[in-house]
Swiss-Prot record:
Keywords: Acetylation, Cytoplasm, Cytoskeleton, GTP-binding, Hydrolase, Magnesium, Metal-binding, Microtubule, Nucleotide-binding. Tubulin is the major constituent of microtubules, a cylinder consisting of laterally associated linear protofilaments composed of alpha- and beta-tubulin heterodimers. Microtubules grow by the addition of GTP-tubulin dimers to the microtubule end, where a stabilizing cap forms. Below the cap, tubulin dimers are in GDP-bound state, owing to GTPase activity of alpha-tubulin. Undergoes a tyrosination/detyrosination cycle, the cyclic removal and re-addition of a C-terminal tyrosine residue by the enzymes tubulin tyrosine carboxypeptidase (TTCP) and tubulin tyrosine ligase (TTL), respectively. It holds the Pfam family Tubulin. One of its GO terms (molecular function) is metal ion binding. InterPro entries: Alpha_tubulin (IPR002452), Tub_FtsZ_C (IPR008280), Tubulin (IPR000217), Tubulin/FtsZ-like_C (IPR037103), Tubulin/FtsZ_2-layer-sand-dom (IPR018316), Tubulin/FtsZ_GTPase_sf (IPR036525), Tubulin_C (IPR023123), Tubulin_CS (IPR017975). CDD domains: alpha_tubulin. Its main location: cytoplasm. Its cofactor is Mg(2+). The record marks Y451 as: Involved in polymerization. It comes from Enteroctopus dofleini (North Pacific giant octopus). It catalyses: GTP + H2O = GDP + phosphate + H(+). This is Tubulin alpha chain. Belongs to the tubulin family.
Amino acid sequence: MRECISIHVGQAGVQIGNACWELYCLEHGIQPSGQMPSDKAVGGKDDSFNTFFSETGSGKHVPRAVFVDLEPTVVDEIRTGLYRQLFHPEQLITGKEDAANNYARGHYTIGKEHIDLVLDRVRKLSDQCTGLQGFLIFHSFGGGTGSGFTSLLMERLSVDYGKKSKLEFSIYPAPQVATAVVEPYNSILTTHTTLEHSDCAFMVDNEAIYDICKRNLDIERPSYTNLNRLISQVVSSITASLRFDGALNVDLTEFQTNLVPYPRIHFPLVTYAPIISAEKAYHEQLAVAEVTSACFEPANQMVKCDPRHGKYMACCMLYRGDVVPKDVNAAIATIKTKRSIQFVDWCPTGFKVGINYQPPTVVPGGDLAKVQRAVCMLSNTTAVAEAWARLDHKFDLMYAKRAFVHWYVGEGMEEGEFSEAREDLAALEKDYEEVGLDTFEAEEEEGGDEY
């Protein structure tokens, strides 16, 4: 089996985890108690969904997941909520005091008290796996636990599970809707620390999701529940190929192989289509060609940046539902003829396709319409550098005045870590710039100085 363990860190990670597991249960017909009436072979290990659920002797399905937060309120909602019977109590780990939006508290002071317990739980989950494929880690960049504890966890997972893939789903701080003043600090510190430990990180920008909810789903004031349900659809599309049998299945390592040309350039842009409310879906034609071209609209992206200003290095199209390869090929051929979509000259083919026959499921009472087919596009584009540049600029404004730095130093960090992290991100921006240069431009630049 190719099992995946999901780790949900901090408030954002835990709440997205809630939405994801609710959706997985609906997709697989698993009840909130963990029973699965449709599963005839009790204890059968060969079902595809066993990558995400382990099965007990009594036929109960338990998510292969750990929820961690340094303060209890958010995880308590799971302990008392509809799905409280689904999880083993030991999978829900909470501390007593939170990280207070402070990376240093999450990574050093408070985080290190809990890390061994968390790793112990992860160890127990991995012992139940026959062929652990890797970890999916959900967290935000802006919070103290999401940034600090995640980076500590990633470092330790690299030590304990060396070669196993680690994929992140990271909530990028929204440019307008900030929940903390120090988000730029936390984001840059966590990115610097996890950069070498993460194999692939899918960024989700809260503001982009707000705009999609307002524009496509006509929700005037989107709540976190609305955002998380949308994010869970995207996560479900990315993981569908691991949980169902499909025509063209894609596993975790395959994502990396096809999306990450250089180890540091591992931040694919996620786009999902169709995002549409029930009343609109009734009147629109959503064939493969339409949903495919919708993926190249910046408005449907999960991070605010403009790929028309950058170049694509690789593109992964994950279709689900009623889709045949012939339609996909036609749709992609059309896309390739458009001038606005540019690939780097060293990567001419650029498209990887996955098809899964399981149509998208929607949460009853949710905002999304039930559709016959959907596509999730993961593209590695140089335009993502815009998002880093925005964050770096905010970091610089605060750091020039050393604002708020004493809170971090007081928790045992050194000021040098700030400048080190900032330099690393400057290098990351430069990496993106160089990757986007055409081959001959790059050679001209290098050719000037003889060594």
